[in-house]
Amino acid sequence: MNLRLCSCCRHNGIVSEQGYEYCIFCESVFQKCTKVQKKSNFHVSNKLIHLRNVLRRLLSHQCSGEIISELLDIMEKNQISTDDVDANFVSSFLKANERINKKDYKLVFEIINQVKDEKLNLSTEKINEVVEIFKHLVFFCQENTPSKTINYSFFLDKIFDITSVTKNLKPQTVKNYTKNNSNQLVWENFLAHMRSKKRVTMVEDYGHEYVFVDERFSTCSLEV
């Protein structure tokens, strides 16, 4: 299979589909004819795989117990309550800790979860609900936003909140306030879209049948 050079990321990753082309590396979409089908099977599947990895990570304890103990000692020394622990606090701690090489939002979420000693409500049914909402969000972003990049920490926190998985995994705010406001606006528009959307009884799952029962969605918290 010969993959052509992508003009955006400069990798040989251009794949041709009917009516459009997309890059398997940066996921850019290029028009081949007048009408473009914006939904990319690869894009949706890739996002769902990443989501599954995030959920698995939140249910595991990969962070060293020494790191957790060190953070708890700092909190006790400075009289910081677990209620005040958020992603900004944990991220600052990780940046100052030279023993941790990989500092990503999944590690931050895991540490917050351990520090607060919270049992996440992630049963099989709840995972199905999270995946369903996330899938609708991916479709919505593809159709209604100029960028297909999704801020996982921001949107997962929103989804976890409305599905009652947890209210404690507060994402880190970025210095670019325009970006923060943009994410919030996308979320509010997505909620409005879902509230006005009639229930769909059948949606392609792009090879992720293991998430659903009888190829139908579980009850969604966004339905009104």
Curated annotation (Swiss-Prot):
Keywords: Activator, Late protein, Transcription, Transcription regulation. Pfam families: A2L_zn_ribbon, Pox_VLTF3. InterPro entries: Poxvirus_VLTF3, VLTF-3_Zn_ribbon. The keyword Lipoprotein does not apply. It comes from the Viruses. One of its GO terms (biological process) is regulation of viral transcription. Belongs to the orthopoxvirus VLTF-3/OPG127 family. Interacts with the late transcription elongation factor VLTF-4/OPG110. Interacts with the late transcription factors VLTF-1/OPG093. Acts with RNA polymerase to initiate transcription from late gene promoters. This is Viral late gene transcription factor 3. The lineage of its organism: Viruses, Varidnaviria, Bamfordvirae, Nucleocytoviricota, Pokkesviricetes. The gene is OPG127.
